[in-house]
A protein has these predicted regions:
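Bacterial N-terminal signal peptides that target proteins for export
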Residues: 1-7
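Active-site substrate-binding loop specific to GH73 endo-beta-N-acetylglucosaminidase modules
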Residues: 196, 220, 224-227, 236, ...
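N-terminal mature-domain "stem" immediately C-terminal to a signal peptide or N-terminal signal-anchor/transmembrane
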Residues: 193-239
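Sec/Tat-exported extracytoplasmic proteins
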Residues: 33, 37, 55-62, 67, ...
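Flexible, low-complexity segments enriched for small/polar residues
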Residues: 205-212, 290, 470-474, 478-507, ...
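Residue-level detector of buried hydrophobic side-chain packing
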Residues: 11, 33-34, 53, 96, ...
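Short, composition-biased motifs enriched in small/polar/acidic residues
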Residues: 19-193
């Protein structure tokens, strides 16, 4: 082979959305690079070296120095190899590719990740015929944590560990984001000063759509000041909003009245006014996994405290450990009533009585491990014949049903297994009566054998331990939580990262919901808009869209404190959902729902579209129009009771239609209003005669637009 038979061709790899990097604006360029080189246009070639700034960001070269660029410094033959020489940047991945004229395709020949800066070489075995080669550069994320090796090098982190920041158990991506947020300057690992980057308004609004019931102007300003990471730190240790207390605040002592309206009133008061928004959103998400429902269940529906007490269980553990939450749910009288393991008796074959299997089935299928064995990335495991592997069978259900026998009423009325109780007594946990608990061994999930001779409570402990130790629980529940906060179709890498935190929070603890929630919200796929292209994001729940609208404009009435006159019977019909009002234990929608059309053809899911029927879309639009125009008055209440949005700020902008729409875009759609929608709203606003009508028209059109309905 002569040197002339090897033709080098240089090509740079462009940054792709979703590549491993801290990229909060979704521009495809690392925020760290942008802060090192502030104000540069990615499309420009500032130093005139023939490479635009975006390409230099990928290569890690200096966009202000025309001599700093990716180039082949030399090519020589050594034995039977062609040796390429170039100057590398620490943490960047370099690949020599060869072109195949027969197929027209390039293939990787040799790859290395630069462990040091300066001269680099790669030796490529050379064929006898002429070859065309190219040198490509890309970012590399060896530990899969969402920060690339170049960024980790700047911070002094390691690309071999996702928890190398020295900040306890915090993931490196989250630590990197916190490092960059704020004002003033920070020092990189080599002592280089770098200006910090406080989050911009649009990023904060989008984040609050994911992590709260929606931002209002004050909350948005606060998060812009303390940073997304700073707000997360505040929220992970707040005082607990207890809905029973909220209900009692509105309704007097526990037995004063149990009218179900007060549950909804209490929920709304918490969602609209409480500061611990992250915990409340997690409680709402958990209520759609560990489902009980007032729909068609008089005991639950007719007593506001029964509903609130169950919700309190979810809130109490929402940032705690899932194993503890699962235990309290298993013992809750509300769940015992709903899934019929309250007064579930031991077997008596002589009369054909066997334990009820309802709760035993659903605690596996819906609350912990699902139907099919999963890999850590959520994909199904397959047997040797390529078939999905069930996690359990009917025998397992029958054995698990034996575990959940012997429960009777607890509290003051729980004097025996057969004692009855009124509705208020349902707020007390169930009590185990061993005389009605199934004796003997129980062969349950994961080949676990619960020994004979234990108490009922010991059997339950063993069963819950087995479920929470099962490898399925991490990817199964993590996916359900991701779907409630950030996206319907998480990539395998996203789900794998979150499931890894479920399996180990950094201290060896499994099921730490606080750590899992931070992993969900502070993942690069959550913090980077459209990280997974047009498969990113989710359709927002209609009920939460209503709450977000009311919060954005601080809807209140003249009462101090405000009251929330919400009729519980109207929203399921209008929106297809209301907290604790699912039509079945399977929630309002299935996590794998695939609407007909393009989504199904592409293998994508959209759970929320299962309740998007034509009549609900029309009724929901009419209701939102009524709320915007008149306020929320489902009881046709006196004017003093009606919740009215405060439109004073947008009304002050109404003389300038473009300024008005831009303000609402930043508040409601995080700057993502499409140009066509923006122009249509401006034209509609200009056609209105008064400031009031201009604002109402603009708000209505925006909240009904895809840009508000779909979170990207």
């Amino acid at each position: 082979m002569s040197r002339r038979s090897v033709i080098p061709l240089l090509m740079l790899l462009s940054a792709l959305p979703g590549a491993a990097m801290l990229d909060q604006d979704g521009g495809g360029i690392s925020d760290f690079w942008q802060q090192l080189h502030p104000g540069l246009d990615p499309a420009a070639d500032t130093d005139g070296d023939g490479f635009d700034n975006a390409s230099e960001a990928v290569a890690g070269t200096d966009p202000l120095d025309k001599d700093s660029r990716l180039k082949i410094d030399g090519l020589e033959r050594m034995g039977e190899s062609a040796v390429f020489h170039w100057s590398g940047v620490v943490g960047k991945a370099y690949t020599i590719e060869r072109f195949d004229p027969a197929t027209g395709e390039w293939s990787a020949v040799e790859t290395e990740v630069a462990s040091s800066a300066g001269p680099r070489t790669l030796a490529v075995p050379a064929a006898e015929t002429a070859g065309i080669f190219r040198l490509r550069v890309a970012d590399h994320d060896g530990d899969g944590d969402g920060l690339n090796a170049w960024e980790e090098g700047l911070l002094g982190f390691s690309d071999d560990s996702s928890r190398s920041s020295g900040q306890g158990n915090r993931q490196d991506f989250s630590a990197g984001l916190r490092f960059l947020e704020g004002s003033g300057t920070a020092l990189l690992a080599d002592g280089t000063p770098i200006p910090r980057r406080p989050p911009v308004r649009e990023e904060v609004v989008r984040f609050l759509v994911q992590a709260s019931f929606g931002g209002d102007p004050d909350l948005i300003d606060h998060v812009m000041t303390v940073g997304i990471g700073g707000w997360m730190d505040e929220q992970l240790e707040p005082a607990v909003t207890t809905l029973t207390n909220v209900v009692m605040y509105n309704n007097g002592p526990l037995n004063a009245s149990t009218f179900p309206q007060f549950w909804s009133r209490g929920w709304w008061r918490a969602a609209m006014t409480s500061s611990d928004q992250l915990r409340l959103r997690m409680g709402n998400a958990l209520s759609q996994i560990l489902v009980i429902s007032a729909a068609g269940n008089d005991v639950i529906r007719q007593n506001s405290f029964v509903q609130a007490d169950y919700y309190d269980i979810l809130l109490t553990h929402s940032l705690g450990n899932y194993r503890n939450l699962l235990e309290d749910v298993s013992y809750s009288t509300q769940m015992g009533f709903y899934l019929s393991h309250l007064k579930n008796r031991k077997s008596d074959p002589s009369i054909g009585r066997f334990p009820d299997e309802n709760f035993a089935r659903e605690i596996m299928q819906l609350f912990t491990i699902g139907l099919w064995e999963l890999n850590p990335d959520g994909s199904r495991k397959l047997d040797e014949e390529g078939n999905a592997i069930p996690t359990y069978d009917n025998t397992t259900i029958m054995e698990m049903a034996k575990v959940f026998t012997g429960f009777g009423f607890g509290g003051p009325t729980g004097t025996s297994f057969f004692a009855t109780a009124n509705a208020t007594a349902y707020v007390h946990p169930m009590k185990m009566w061993d005389s009605e608990h199934e004796p003997g061994e129980k062969h349950i999930i994961g080949d676990v054998v619960i020994p004979a001779g234990q108490t009922g409570e010991e059997d339950i402990d063993d069963a819950l331990d087995a479920l929470c130790a099962h490898p399925n629980i991490a990817p199964f529940i993590s996916r359900l939580l991701i779907q409630r906060f950030t996206c319907s179709n998480p990539t395998p890498d996203y789900l794998r990262r979150v499931a890894a935190v479920w399996d180990n929070n950094g201290s060896g603890e499994r099921g730490d919901l606080k750590a899992v929630l931070e992993a969900i919200l502070m993942d690069p796929e959550a913090r980077t808009p459209k990280a997974n292209g047009d498969a990113s994001g989710m359709v927002r729940e209609p009920y939460l869209r209503l709450v977000a609208l009311m919060r954005a404009f601080k809807a209140r009435n003249t009462h101090n404190p405000p009251i929330f006159p919400v009729w519980i019977g109207e929203f399921p019909k209008i929106f297809g959902q209301q907290p604790l009002w699912a039509p079945s234990v399977f929630n309002f929608y299935l996590p794998d729902h695939q609407p007909a059309g393009e989504l199904r053809e592409r293998g994508l899911v959209s759970p929320e579209l299962e309740i998007a029927s034509a009549d609900r879309l029309i009724n929901g639009d009419n209701f939102l129009q009524r709320v915007i125009d008149r306020g929320m008055d489902p009881f046709t209440m006196p004017a003093a009771d009606v919740l009215v949005c405060d439109f004073s700020t947008p009304q002050a902008l109404s003389s300038d239609a473009a300024a008005l729409v831009d303000y609402l875009d930043s508040l409601l759609t995080w700057g993502e209003l499409s140009p066509s929608t923006r122009q249509a709203v401006i034209i509609a606003v200009q056609a209105q005669a008064t400031a009031e009508l201009k604002v109402e028209t603009a708000v209505h059109l925006i909240v009904e637009s895809p840009d508000f309905v779909v979170l990207k």
